[in-house]
Amino acid sequence: LIALSLRWKHYVPALLAAVLLSACGGGGDSGNNAAQLTSTPAGQLTQEPGAPVLSNNIATDGFNWINYRRSQVGLAPLVRNSLIDSAAQGHTSYLNINNLVAHEQIQGKPGFTGVAPYDRIIKSGYAITSVWGEVIAGVATNSGFYMAENLITAIYHRFVIFEPLFKEGGAGSAVNSSGYAYFTTDLAGNSRYGLGLPTGQVITYPFNGQVKVATSFSSNEETPDPVPNQDVVGYPISVHANFDATLSVTAFTVRQHGSGTDLTVRLLTKSTDPINTARSVAAIIPLAPLLANTTYDVSFIGKVSGADVTRSWSFTTR
């Protein structure tokens, strides 16, 4: 089970988990959707050169993996904050005690620390003045790396994790007697936002030159389903701007290196997917799994708040 929550002024994904992944949040406007995911088996998530050193602490490893991926795409890593740690650990303990995965707590239940992520972060003593978010993973694994990577695979969750303006975060973990692990990362900002991206800039994922990218993604296991009526699809490819920017797409394509034919994809933008996709992000999802050990070329042409943006990059599957 994985859950994610975010609050910001313009985009409020609210993803509530039933099985494996979820996200929820707010910050001004509000909206609701849900997300679940089973992705790469843990045994297939291999340690990469330059990756964080495994600590065998779920909270630390999950938090560090999120920062590792953020750094790889050119985003500022989240600064770990002890007050946010307290909020995340309190909620993780609540989930473990009550054997569930959810963003909202019910007053009166054992371990109650606050109804919503915002309440819990504020109660910890952290003064939120801008954005907040929450990621929760619950799965029978002891790998924080794996839990965080699952969230990044799920496209609606990735949109939030790779928000450029997040500033600080904290994490907590717990494991029950059956070996079922819970991992929570809370993200927030005060004194406005993090540095974000320069005006008119974007980041992409998979990033240019990335290797060992997964070939497929189980769309049915993320709710809302990003590719309705189809389960196994190709690995999602995404473009991200600051949340207060407007990203428009003129062309967004992917093809096997050396091929003259673009893959058939589903495009996610604010105009094609208005409920679940923010105005600052876009993604394409190939409608068939990618080939193993194959390089793919991606092209994006569009605008960020009216400024022309063109990107061409490649990645290679495992």
Where are each of the predicted segments found?
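A generic local structural motif
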Residues: 5-6, 138-139, 283
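Acidic, low-complexity Ser/Thr/Gly/Pro-rich repeat segments typical of extracellular/periplasmic
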Residues: 54, 226-318
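Functional surface patches built around histidine and acidic residues
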Residues: 2, 25-258, 297-300
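Short, solvent-exposed coil/turn linker segments
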Residues: 1, 116, 266-270
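Sec-dependent N-terminal signal peptides
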Residues: 14-18
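Bacterial N-terminal signal peptides that target proteins for export
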Residues: 1-13
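C-terminal motif of bacterial Sec signal peptides marking the signal peptidase cleavage site
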Residues: 20-23
